[in-house]
Amino acid sequence: MPRLTARRLHVLGKLALGCGALLTVTAPAKLPAATGLGRPSPASAASGVSEKGISAAECTANHRAGTIVFATSYSYAPAASIADVVVAARRGYFKDMCLDVSLQPGFSTDNVALVSADRVQISSLGSDSEVLAARAEGANLEGVLTYGHTAISELITPGDAKITNLKQLDGTTVGIKGALPYEVSAMLTKAGVDIASLKLVQVGYNPVIIDQGRIMALPVYKSNEIRELNVLGYRYKVWDPTSYGVAASFASLVANRGFAQAHPTAVADFLRADIAGFWWAYRHQDQAVAYCEQLVPPQLGITRPVGRFRWRVESGLVIRYTPTKEPIGAIDLSLVKVEYAQDVRLHLVAAGVNIHTAFNLTFISEIYRGTTLVWPKNFAS
């Protein structure tokens, strides 16, 4: 898969990701007891879960799914589509849904082959564009949830470089980690930058390189490097893809198509527990970050302050940019269509993908009543 391989982190990054811990959550042998604190939920849903609990039939069906392996998209960093899953595991939400779940650290594009081969049943990818790219290359997976409906990456230039137009970057050196993010590539192209003229060089994870005269631009995460530069007092200029009308997304969950077809209630209830984990993590940010901190390898440098900033920014973007009258995690095909058309036009993703089969909206529709998650009121929440 040439496009995805080009987007992978360099070897040191992948080694660091592989050092994370495995976390296994085993479902109870019997129907979970309706104990613990909870909040009222809608009376019913299009499955065997209601405010009263989970039906014996659905619990049995979920047991039949066996162990669900979930691979994270960036070790156990407290990011959207990771922190929520970690919380769901630690808080017992998967157990409540009669699911056996095993978490393993990973990197988003490396997970495509694992999910496609059913070695991993559910995983997190970086964006809907990554889902589309995977499908364009024949991956046997489908998008089942999208948390972020905006750009998570942006571009920064040195504060003293006097760059007032992105076109000024033509022929300059740009630092990257793997490859240019989809939304940054789209922004540069929209601004008239000759991408082929850029000298793309692999750089490390320290963003202060933007102030060392070696590069003229650096893609960063809104939820990560910006904090470090601010703390250290560095000056920089931000170029946000959203200001250029770029369609973007982040934190997408995918499932193996065969597994999803064979075990639809297990996939739906995994997402149900995950979204319950998202809301708990949003309300208890310090504890959610602490859960992740216990699993993330120290060499990634994700300290408690760094983790808090990442989760606060990403969870805030998820809520702020969720389309009106749609629930958290919903896949909006109208937005996917725009993002895909943009990717094809800019030669970022191959044409020919059917977005209606690349994404499965059924699971999200089954776990919500309107915009309220169906969750048993006597289960922990």
Tell what function each PLM region has.
Residues 75, 171-174, 213-216, 258-260, ...:
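Second-shell loop/turn segments in exported
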Residues 1-19:
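N-terminal export and membrane-targeting signals
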Residues 147-157, 231-260, 267, 271:
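Periplasmic-binding protein-like
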Residues 336-381:
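Conserved C-terminal helix/tail region of periplasmic/extracytoplasmic solute-binding proteins
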Residues 37-203, 207-212, 216-220, 239, ...:
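Short, glycine-/small- and polar/acidic-enriched structural segments
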Residues 263-349:
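Secondary-structure end/capping motifs
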Residues 29-37:
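Bacterial lipoprotein signal-peptidase II cleavage site
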